[in-house]
Swiss-Prot record:
Belongs to the UreD family. Required for maturation of urease via the functional incorporation of the urease nickel metallocenter. It is found in: Cytoplasm. Keywords: Chaperone, Cytoplasm, Nickel insertion. InterPro entries: UreD. UreD, UreF and UreG form a complex that acts as a GTP-hydrolysis-dependent molecular chaperone, activating the urease apoprotein by helping to assemble the nickel containing metallocenter of UreC. The UreE protein probably delivers the nickel. GO terms for cellular component: cytoplasm. This is Urease accessory protein UreD. Its main location: cytoplasm. The keyword Chloroplast does not apply. Coiled coil: none annotated. It comes from Enterobacter sp. (strain 638).
Length: 274
């Protein structure tokens, strides 16, 4: 891995990570990993032969006001990577400066990405701007999720102040499939029905049969989960007061979708069990 140290300026970390995966006759390999500052990855491993499993490491102290993190992931033709993290991401309270996280993913022909990060926790007073953009080829495959925690509900702490600006985009052959923006500020959580846990799971390509199968699995979550299918993109939403309910539902649906979308049996990362 090529790394460049970054200085911690008074306005925060300026960190970046650029990953490129390529396919070989034996397996997908991490062809290059360039990082600046406290963004890095562990050594890839292969619990299911050719698929590359990779753990991405965020700054150990979390993300604070003034930090800007940029992540770029490139999957060359026929490559397959599953990326997760050993722990939750954290946005801490800020006295004013924004904390930014920009994530861009580029999938070429027949490439497969499973982007399965753990929770992102927003402490009260955080001022966070997040952007996740997926660029797909029509023959590529995507299973991706994000799970936000507003405050620390386990200790009855709410996201009583601060701002969160999040943007989620999916592009297919340079045409937009999904462009979604969410704004939360000043403790007003009415747009999420005052739920502290917000989950989104994306699947491409998907069919009407997959949509109906997912909806059947969401029945037990009452009105706080739903699924839609638009031009082959399956979008599944979750709201919850309980992180275990939300996490379990997302993981169960991922396990259900994986054999249909990428023709592989589920192989949950070991780090999820710790």
């Amino acid at each position: 891995m090529q790394g460049t140290p970054a200085k911690k300026h008074t306005h925060g970390w300026q960190a970046s990570l650029a990953l490129q995966f390529c396919h070989t006759p034996e397996k997908t390999v991490l062809h290059s990993a360039r990082h600046v500052g406290p963004l890095t990855v562990q050594r890839p491993f292969y619990p299911e032969e050719e698929t590359c499993h990779l753990y991405l490491l965020h700054p150990p102290g979390g993300i604070v006001g003034g930090d800007e993190l940029n992540i770029s992931v490139q999957l060359d033709p026929n490559s397959h990577a599953l990326i997760t993290m050993p722990g939750a991401g954290k946005f801490y309270r800020s006295s004013g400066p924004l904390a930014r996280l920009n994530q861009h993913f580029f999938l070429e022909e027949n490439a497969t990405l499973e982007w399965l990060p753990q929770d992102t926790i927003f402490f009260p007073g955080a001022n966070a701007v997040l952007q996740s953009v997926f660029h797909l080829h029509h023959s590529s495959r995507l299973l991706a999720w994000e799970l936000f925690c507003l405050g620390r509900p386990v200790i009855n702490e709410t996201f009583s102040h601060g701002t969160i600006e999040s943007r989620l985009e999916v592009w297919l052959d340079d045409e937009p499939l999904l462009i979604e923006r969410q704004h939360l500020a000043d403790g007003d959580l009415t747009t999420v029905a005052n739920h502290p846990w917000i989950g989104t799971l994306l699947c491409y390509p998907a069919s009407d049969a997959l949509l109906e199968g997912v909806r059947e699995k969401l029945v037990t979550l009452d009105n706080f989960a739903g699924a839609t299918l638009t031009d082959g993109l399956l979008s599944i939403r979750f709201l919850s007061h309980d992180n275990l309910i939300c996490q379990r539902a997302m993981r169960e649906i991922w396990q259900c979708l994986r054999p249909h979308v990428i023709a592989k049996t589920p192989h949950p990362p070991r780090i999820w069990q710790t």
